[in-house]
Amino acid sequence: MAGHSKWANTKHRKAAQDAKRGKIFTKIIRELVTAARLGGGDPATNPRLRAAVDKALSNNMTRDTLNRAIARGAGNDENDNMETIIYEGYGPGGTAVMVECLSDNRNRTVSDVRHAFTKTGGNLGTDGSVSYLFTKKGVISYAPGVDEDAVMEAALEAGAEDVETYDDGAIDVYTTPEAFGEVKDAMDAAGFVAESAEVSMIPSTKAELDIDTAPKLMRLIDMLEDSDDVQEVYHNGDISDEVAKQLEDIL
């Protein structure tokens, strides 16, 4: 999940492990290639590519690797038949889950996604079953230690929709998808270095999970993310400080 929610913090360890395996880079490269193929190789005129570039840089991908992926996509490789597919369903604890995939084989992908839901006690739903609970937004995250007032002032002046602060000093800046690149550029120019920046699906309501259901949702997310076809998993699961601490102890 994007941002600095308690849930996102419990996933940092898993994200670090994924990065070591190269899985995150593989997924980002596929998104760069597809975005460039569909909208051209210039991030300035291709919002989807711009978001992918920001995500690549946030994950410390080298410019060389990034540029090669864009060049591959902009070259209109006829063998690249990837399409974006969104699956929706309900996970453990009644959580709403959206799964964004890039695939060249729908049958393989839906089989993998359905298997993950079934194995963890969830259900794969139909189009529209949970998407109404999410809104697409840009999320620019800053680590604890930045000047809260300065970030808020710069973000709102740049056209951000909202700014959320956390007890530990972390900050999330929210934008419309269309304004994401412009706001990110303005924040960079103002000297604020983002910890991460991406366009994400933000839930409008949260489903509170206890210590029994939270690990089950984590297993569902892990199973989905282990599929090469799955690019992003969005959910509305939420955990209390107490459950977050318990999860950290058992992870």
Curated annotation (Swiss-Prot):
A molecular-function term among this protein's GO annotations: DNA binding
Biological process according to GO: regulation of DNA-templated transcription
Subcellular location: Cytoplasm
Any one Pfam family match given in the protein's UniProt record, by short name: Transcrip_reg
UniProt KW Transcription keyword: yes
Cited PANTHER family: TRANSCRIPTIONAL REGULATORY PROTEIN YEBC-RELATED, TRANSLATIONAL ACTIVATOR OF CYTOCHROME C OXIDASE 1
Record's keyword terms, sorted: Cytoplasm, DNA-binding, Transcription, Transcription regulation
UniProt-listed HAMAP family: Transcrip_reg_TACO1 (MF_00693)
Protein name (Swiss-Prot/TrEMBL): Probable transcriptional regulatory protein PMI1113
GO CC annotations on file: cytosol
Keyword DNA-binding in annotation: yes
Species, as recorded: Proteus mirabilis (strain HI4320)
Gene3D superfamilies, per the entry: 1.10.10.200, 3.30.70.980
Similarity field: Belongs to the TACO1 family.
Source species taxonomy: Bacteria, Pseudomonadati, Pseudomonadota, Gammaproteobacteria, Enterobacterales
Record-annotated disulphide pairs: none
